[in-house]
């Protein structure tokens, strides 16, 4: 009986200490994850604040080709205009759509044709016209109308030709960009100590 009690006590102590050690390890791991997330949150908050307030933050042009996107074009463009970044423009390139993509954009975003000296730095299918909004709410929006080039690259190149800012992001018009996507894209540029060889950055 005495031996049984001793064995039971030994097993109890073993399992108790093992459980306690496991709990300590688990708590330490969870604390590490929590601290890492909190650090990441504060770092990102600092980055966003710095980018927002710095007078040296570079402008970014978001370029998106659109071909026969009448069903979703309004929602997709509105999503792009809602991005958080201090200096950016959204360039939608209507690549010779045969539906009402152009008409819907013109009506919804109060767009009017404006004179524009198109400089073909990159060769594309012929440029037709350029639209801007009369509504201050959509002041960042530019609509380029061109002949269909057969590829998204041709439409993107037309957008690059009219871009106002030194960096650009080429994406699809139906892609949903995360709210702070431009911050993440431009961070490597402003934090790099090396001078960039090119004057433009393109990520797709």
Where on the chain are the PLM-derived regions?
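N-terminal membrane-anchoring/stem segments of glycan-assembly enzymes
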Residues: 1-54
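Glycine-rich, basic loop-to-helix element that forms the pyrophosphate-binding segment
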Residues: 48, 76, 121-163
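Cell-envelope/extracellular polymer assembly enzymes that use nucleotide-activated donors
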Residues: 58-61, 89
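Short, acidic, metal-binding catalytic loop of nucleotide-sugar glycosyltransferases
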Residues: 78-87, 107-115
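A conserved acidic beta->alpha catalytic loop
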Residues: 94-114, 148
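Acidic donor-binding/catalytic loop of UDP-sugar-dependent glycosyltransferases
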Residues: 100, 171-188
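Short aromatic/hydrophobic "clamp" motif used to bind/position activated sugar donors
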Residues: 168
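Conserved donor NDP-sugar-binding/catalytic core segment of glycosyltransferases
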Residues: 180-204
């Amino acid at each position: 009986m005495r031996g049984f009690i001793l064995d039971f006590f030994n097993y109890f102590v073993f399992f108790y200490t093992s459980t306690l050690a496991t709990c300590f390890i688990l708590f330490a791991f969870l604390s590490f994850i929590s601290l890492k997330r909190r650090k990441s949150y504060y770092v990102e908050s600092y980055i966003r604040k710095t980018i927002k307030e710095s007078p040296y933050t570079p402008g970014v042009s978001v370029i998106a080709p659109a071909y026969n996107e009448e069903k979703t074009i309004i929602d997709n463009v509105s999503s792009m205009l809602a991005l958080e970044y201090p200096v950016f423009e959204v360039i939608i390139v209507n690549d010779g759509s045969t539906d009402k993509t152009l008409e819907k954009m013109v009506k919804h975003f109060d767009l009017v044709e404006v004179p524009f000296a198109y400089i073909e730095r990159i060769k594309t299918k012929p440029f037709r016209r350029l639209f801007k909004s009369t509504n201050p709410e959509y002041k960042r929006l530019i609509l380029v109308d061109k002949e269909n080039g057969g590829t998204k690259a041709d439409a993107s190149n037309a957008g690059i030709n009219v871009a106002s800012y030194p960096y650009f992001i080429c994406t699809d018009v139906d892609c949903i960009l995360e709210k702070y996507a431009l911050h993440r894209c431009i961070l490597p540029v402003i934090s790099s100590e090396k001078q960039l060889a090119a004057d433009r950055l393109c990520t797709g």
